[in-house]
Amino acid sequence: MTQTTVKNVKNYIGGEWIESRTEKTEDVFNPATGEVIAQVPISTTEDVHHAIEVANEAFKTWKEVPVPKRARILFKYQQLLVEHWEELAKLITLENGKNYAEAYGEVQRGIENVEFATGAPSLMMGEQLASIATELESGVYRYPIGVIGGITPFNFPMMVPCWMFPMAIATGNTFVMKPSERTPLLANRLAELLEEAGLPNGVFNIVHGAHDVVNGLLDHKKVAAISFVGSQPVAEYVYKRGTQNLKRVQALAGAKNHSIVLSDANLENATTQILNAAFGSAGERCMAASVVAVEEDVADEFVTLLTQKANEIKIGNGLDEGVFLGPVIRDQHKERTLQYIESGEEEGANLVRDGRTDEAAKQEGYFVGPTIFDHVTSEMKIWQDEIFAPVLSIARVNNLEEGVDLANESRFANGACIFTRDGGSVRRFRETIDAGMLGVNIGVPAPMAFLPFSGWKDSFYGDLHANGKDGLQFYTRKKVLTTKWV
């Protein structure tokens, strides 16, 4: 790719594409080739303050737009997303690296979130009690809260923003988004389609950048709430700084999701599900399967079957036919992953499959093949840390209780899955596991748009989760009206 094809990314503020006030930029890479595809501005505090002021001014009129009219704009937006799904999926693969089928799935999940937000007229209905005392009645009414700041990650550049801004603007708020500087192109395309759908200027804005933009959102008095998805250290930082500034904050953080495979499980299904959950999206998702606790009776068979399937995975550019495993996002992330593999070896885990030796891992791009460790213990870094890469740890346990205890040792608690045919085991798992999203005989128990994305412990900071009724409640506040008729 020649330098003349490199795209100059701009901010989107008040319905206009605006150059940042900064001269500092970062390269955006195609992780499958290492080629530069764009340059993104590392915007200034002044840039984000400008966007916040514009959004605050737009809020004064947008909040007065009838809810059904706001919903109709989102209906149009949903139609445009459907019409452009192929383009959007290719763009995701280009700048994120995941395979085209996974990118298509992400587009569909984003569209589903927009569809859910179009139900705002029903979702925002209040409550009434006709008689709370003699000739007294009370009613509850929902209202938007103001300017929302959204900080989104590279791993789901469409789905995660669509968790946030459709519901936020459907409920009458305005929005300033800071997408990942690694995947800015998809974010800007979403803005273009919103404009085409008829969204008024200033209701949705994008400011690209890094720390200054994040801090600008967290500190500005006219930002009412912050929605964040990203790594645990940054999530904790966002939550603490945002709440210190008296903002509502929902901060979705890292994970170390455990699957428990019991001896009565269908191993064909279990290995297929876990393979997809561990190595799909190159392991760069907060619902990835990171650890498998497998009962000793079937552990050897499980490891053999899983490794056989991992050996059949096609690695390469996500736009190429048949590719399952694409690259990790950056060369630095690849190097970090290789360090974790070395750490696992040094700490005594059995390296069953070494993703460093795959042919694709030696080519251009940021590839690491599927990597499997056996005999992993909770003292090892590969068990403790979120690696965010195609690295799976297998621990051997004697029973369900040991598997649950192992999972509950982790400070992360996004998701957990069990593979079994026994209903009693499922119930004990459900009641004793410390995690927010659970699966039975599936590998990725991520909820649909109408249910909360409900991580626990260090996987989430806040009270109201993303999606579902939690999302609606996070972006609204209530008035209670009590009336005496005389």
Swiss-Prot record:
EC annotation from Swiss-Prot or TrEMBL: 1.2.1.27
Database matches in InterPro entries: Ald_DH/histidinol_DH, Ald_DH_C, Ald_DH_CS_CYS, Ald_DH_N, Aldehyde_DH_dom, MeMal-semiAld_DH, MSDH_GmP_bac
Active site (UniProt): 286
Pathway where it operates: Polyol metabolism; myo-inositol degradation into acetyl-CoA; acetyl-CoA from myo-inositol: step 7/7
A Pfam family this chain is assigned to: Aldedh
EC category name: oxidoreductase
A GO MF label: methylmalonate-semialdehyde dehydrogenase (acylating, NAD) activity
Reaction(s) catalysed (UniProt annotation): 3-oxopropanoate + NAD(+) + CoA + H2O = hydrogencarbonate + acetyl-CoA + NADH + H(+); 2-methyl-3-oxopropanoate + NAD(+) + CoA + H2O = propanoyl-CoA + hydrogencarbonate + NADH + H(+)
Binding positions (NAD(+)): 154, 178, 181-182, 231, 386
UniProt keyword terms in alphabetical order: NAD, Oxidoreductase
Superkingdom classification of source: Bacteria
Biological process, per Gene Ontology: inositol catabolic process; thymine catabolic process; valine catabolic process
Function of the protein: Catalyzes the oxidation of malonate semialdehyde (MSA) and methylmalonate semialdehyde (MMSA) into acetyl-CoA and propanoyl-CoA, respectively. Is involved in a myo-inositol catabolic pathway. Bicarbonate, and not CO2, is the end-product of the enzymatic reaction.
Sequence similarity: Belongs to the aldehyde dehydrogenase family. IolA subfamily.
Assembly notes: Homotetramer.
Protein name per its UniProtKB record: Malonate-semialdehyde dehydrogenase 2
